[in-house]
C-alpha cells in the first residue's frame, strides 16, 4: 500500500474512533436508504438459513449428511466422479423388506407381501432422489447464486461506501485546514458510492419476484413428489387388499400334531432296548442367534447434541454404520442416531 493509502486508512480509523468513543456525529444516510439496507440484510440472513433448513428437510440424518459430505469432498480431491447420493430412509426400509421377503419365500402370505411393499418403498426412494435433485437445481442453487453474487456485491458496495463516508467526515471536520478541492473530491466519491450501493439494493429488492419463482419451484417439486408417492402407495394398497381377500377366502388349515414318540427305559441288566432312547424331544436352543450387527451398552449415554442416540447400560443396540473411528450409528427402540464407540462392546461386528 502506498504512503497516501496508508494515510487515508489512518484518517478513516481516526474518524471511526472519534465517532464510537468521542461521540462525534457522522454523515447520516436518509431513511429510505436505511430501510433498503435493513431489507437486504434480512434477505441475506433468510437466504442462508432457508438453504440450510431445506437441506436438513431433504436429508434429515446429520450423520448421513456428514458422511456424504466427506465422501463427496474426497471424491472431488481425487478427481473422481461424484460419490453416492444420500441414503434415503425409504431405500433402507425397502432393502430390509425385500431381504426378509426373499428369506420367507412364496409359500406364505407375509413373505410375498413384504416383497411388494419393499418394491414400493424402493420406488418411493427413487422419487425422493428426484425431489432432492429438483429442489437443489431450482431452489437451493439459485439461492446460493443470489448469496454469492448479488448479495456479496451489495455488501462490497456498502463497505466501500462506509469507508468513503469516514474519509469525507474526517476531511469535513478539518475544513479550512485542508484544500477545498480535496474535500470536494471526498464528497463526490461518497455520493458516487452511495448511488451505486443504493442502485444495487433497489434492483435486488425490485426483482424479488425471482425469489417467489424459486419458492414456487420448491412447492411444485414437493407437489409432484407427493403425487407420485400417492400413486405408488395406492397401487401397493390395492395389491395388499387383494392378497388379504384371497387369504380370507381360503379354508383355514388346522394344526395336526405329529404322533409323540415314547421314551424307553433301560432293562434290569443295564441294557437299553432298541439301542436306548427312541425319542429325544425337541432340543433346547442354546441361545438367541444374533444375525445382525449389534452391541451392548457398557455405560449410560445421555445425548447432548441433535442426532445422538441415548441408551442405558445393558441395552442391546442394532448397528447400522460406523461414522469414523470414534462414532457408531445405530437403532434402539425405533430411534436412530449416533453414539461413541467406547461406550459399547461389540456382540456382532459390522460387515467390512
UniProtKB/Swiss-Prot annotation:
Identify the CDD domains for this entry.
BAR_Endophilin_A1 (cd07613), SH3_Endophilin_A (cd11803)
Q: Which organism is it from?
A: Rattus norvegicus
Name listed for the protein in its UniProt record: Endophilin-A1
Which residues get modified to Phosphotyrosine? 299
Where is the region Required for dimerization upon membrane association?
A: 60-87
| One GO MF term | lipid binding
Subunit architecture: Monomer; in cytoplasm. Homodimer; when associated with membranes. Interacts with OPHN1. Interacts with SYNJ1. Interacts with DNM1. Interacts with MAP4K3; the interaction appears to regulate MAP4K3-mediated JNK activation. Interacts with PDCD6IP. Interacts with ATXN2. Interacts with ADAM9 and ADAM15 cytoplasmic tails. Interacts with BIN2. Interacts with TMEM108. Interacts with ADGRB2.
What's in the GO CC field?
A: cell projection; cytoplasm; early endosome; glutamatergic synapse; hippocampal mossy fiber to CA3 synapse; perinuclear region of cytoplasm; photoreceptor ribbon synapse; plasma membrane
Q: Where is the composition biased (Basic and acidic residues)?
A: 246-257
Q: Tell me the segments the record calls region Disordered.
A: 246-289
InterPro entries recorded for this chain? AH/BAR_dom_sf (IPR027267), BAR_dom (IPR004148), Endophilin_A_SH3 (IPR035824), Endophilin_SH3RF (IPR050384), SH3-like_dom_sf (IPR036028), SH3_domain (IPR001452)
**Which residues fall in a coiled-coil region?**
181-250
Region labeled Membrane-binding amphipathic helix — which residues? 1-21
Species classification: Eukaryota, Metazoa, Chordata, Craniata, Vertebrata
Question: What functional role does this protein have?
Answer: Implicated in synaptic vesicle endocytosis. May recruit other proteins to membranes with high curvature. Required for BDNF-dependent dendrite outgrowth. Cooperates with SH3GL2 to mediate BDNF-NTRK2 early endocytic trafficking and signaling from early endosomes.
> What is the recorded membrane topology of this protein?
Peripheral membrane protein
Q: Which GO terms describe its biological process?
A: cellular response to brain-derived neurotrophic factor stimulus; dendrite extension; lipid tube assembly; membrane bending; membrane tubulation; negative regulation of blood-brain barrier permeability; negative regulation of epidermal growth factor receptor signaling pathway; negative regulation of gene expression
- Compositional bias ranges of the Polar residues kind: 269-281
Domain comment, in the record's words? An N-terminal amphipathic helix, the BAR domain and a second amphipathic helix inserted into helix 1 of the BAR domain (N-BAR domain) induce membrane curvature and bind curved membranes. The BAR domain dimer forms a rigid crescent shaped bundle of helices with the pair of second amphipathic helices protruding towards the membrane-binding surface.
Which intervals hold domain BAR? 18-249
Q: Where in the cell is it found?
A: Cytoplasm; Membrane; Early endosome; Presynapse
Additional facts recorded: The N-BAR domain binds liposomes and mediates dimerization of BAR domains upon liposome binding. It induces formation of tubules from liposomes as well as fusion of liposome tubules. Cells overexpressing Sh3gl2 show no effect on transferrin uptake.
Statement: the UniProt record of this protein carries the keyword Cytoplasm: yes
Instruction: Identify the residues that the record assigns to the SH3 domain, covering every copy.
Output: 290-349
